[in-house]
From Swiss-Prot:
Pfam families: IZUMO. This is Izumo sperm-egg fusion protein 2. The keyword Transcription regulation does not apply. Belongs to the Izumo family. Residues 1-20 form the signal peptide. InterPro entries: IZUMO, IZUMO2.
Length: 221
């Protein structure tokens, strides 16, 4: 793996508050670490494949799940449901270490693992947010909740509707809006230029016709 990529990923792992949600469970981190040690580099002959596989696994060990929970959802999840996702991760890592796949087929399995973990994680995030954002259901919540930002177990509370199921990435949204307006402005400019050229050509034709008629009259006199 390139040194720069390794340092970048390790800095994400070592930074305070770099872990969250799934990474709050030390057994999940241990399972992912063991999987990485077992597969890389022994099961990848090409350095490029080693780097890609390492990036997938170390990304899962880093702050990705915390950022996903905070930027897309409210960043909290019921601990009993999160435990199920953690067990899923540990079982899947054991399965991958036990098979004989190598190189590209193994890399594809790692990418599939990440996608499946995200899918399961998303389910529990949505499940809690649906209940916590419901004014009637939220008061009935009793199960302990994990704060993904601080890795702290907290008491469930009702969440104001303005914080429910919203995209908390204004910079990305702003950039998207600017990019989406640019093609429309370009199209409008193109239309204006086309209309202006059409009017100009029409005026030239009219002037030419009038000049021709005047010259013809002079010739006939």
């Amino acid at each position: 793996m390139p040194l720069a990529l390794t340092l970048l990923l390790l800095s994400g792992l070592g930074a305070p508050g770099g872990w969250g949600c799934l990474q709050c469970d030390p057994l999940v981190l241990e399972a992912l670490g063991h999987l990485r040690s077992a597969l890389i580099p022994s099961r990848f002959q090409l350095e490029q494949l080693q780097a890609r596989a390492g990036a997938v696994l170390m990304g899962m060990e880093g702050p990705f799940f915390r950022d996903y929970a905070l930027n897309v959802f409210v960043g909290k999840v019921e601990t009993n449901q999160l435990d199920l996702v953690a067990s899923f991760v540990k079982n899947q890592t054991q399965h991958l270490m036990g098979n004989s796949l190598k190189d590209e087929p193994l890399l594809e399995e790692l990418v599939t693992l990440r996608a499946n973990v995200i899918k399961e994680f998303k389910k529990v995030l949505i499940s809690y947010e649906l209940k916590a954002c419901n004014p009637k259901l939220c008061r009935l919540l009793k199960e302990e909740v994990l704060d993904c930002l601080h890795c702290q177990r907290i008491t469930p509370k009702c969440i104001h509707k303005k914080y429910c199921f919203v995209d908390r990435q204004p910079r990305v949204a702003l950039q998207y809006q600017m990019d989406s307006k640019y093609p429309r402005n370009q199209a409008l400019l193109g239309i204006l230029i086309s209309v202006s050229l059409a009017v100009f050509v029409f005026v030239v034709i009219v002037v030419s016709a009038c000049t021709y008629r005047q010259n013809r009259k002079l010739l006939l006199q």
